[in-house]
């Protein structure tokens, strides 16, 4: 790797937003590299069946979709590097990205590091993803039509998931460790009126019951300590997400949950730096919205680079 080489665009994160940026940038003739810690796709690659991404009438698994996105971007000249980002200096005109494989310099940076769902931390939880354990009701809810599902959580995301699932599943059981929801009151009132939703207050999920897939959960009462088992077909964990932004330090504006503050134009508080996908502040976190962000970031980056070049030219009086 040549540390004196200056890329037009460095993309940190190889999810759908990152590789869409790579595709658009490479097709525009920009010297582009994607730096990904593990494998292409991010959280998407862990999804065993995606039915809500246009163009695949029979659905597609996340790993295959990620592979297609990566190959398409690389076909037009984008490069991929597998490395962990340790530090970034984004303040100058040239941005510096320090990784486990060396230092990369770029004129612009797209941050596409995503957000990971918070897990319960139970034995076999990871292994049962796609086999009864899920973290996204809008992604996986349709697989539980006329089934019994448990939703863990008490905030707005849990309530939203429960409301959506109540229109699909036979029964929805909300398990919350307190005796009241933290969600907005209007959502709370709506759920209370929904016939196929029931609540297990002051309870936590302490164990997953399974064979080849999830068959139930063991609950523990936080007041009495009593335990009991609920039979269910699915468990939706809705206890929040953690954006991957710790490596940024204090140099870029984050909201109180750690998400990068960026609007629909993907611009951050630092000129020439853009945030796409689940890592930025947004209302809807889906593959299609991440893809849209990726295209927008390249559009804004091109405008930024054109303006930077124009401002660097000497003024020649008439």
Describe every region a protein language model picked out:
Residues 121, 127-143, 239-289, 293-296, ...:
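FAD-site-proximal beta/loop scaffold in flavoenzymes
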Residues 14, 113-114, 239-240:
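Glycine-rich, N-terminal phosphate-binding loop of Rossmann-like dinucleotide-binding domains
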Residues 80-142:
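Glycine/small-residue-rich loop that forms an oxyanion/phosphate-binding "nest" at active or ligand-binding sites
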Residues 3-6, 142-148:
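Short helix-loop-beta connector
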Residues 7-76, 159-185, 255:
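Beta1-alpha1 glycine-rich phosphate/pyrophosphate-binding loop at the start
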Residues 15-16, 39, 115-117, 155-157, ...:
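Residue-level detector of alpha-helix initiation sites
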Residues 5, 73-92, 96-98, 104, ...:
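A Rossmann-like FAD-binding core segment of flavoenzymes
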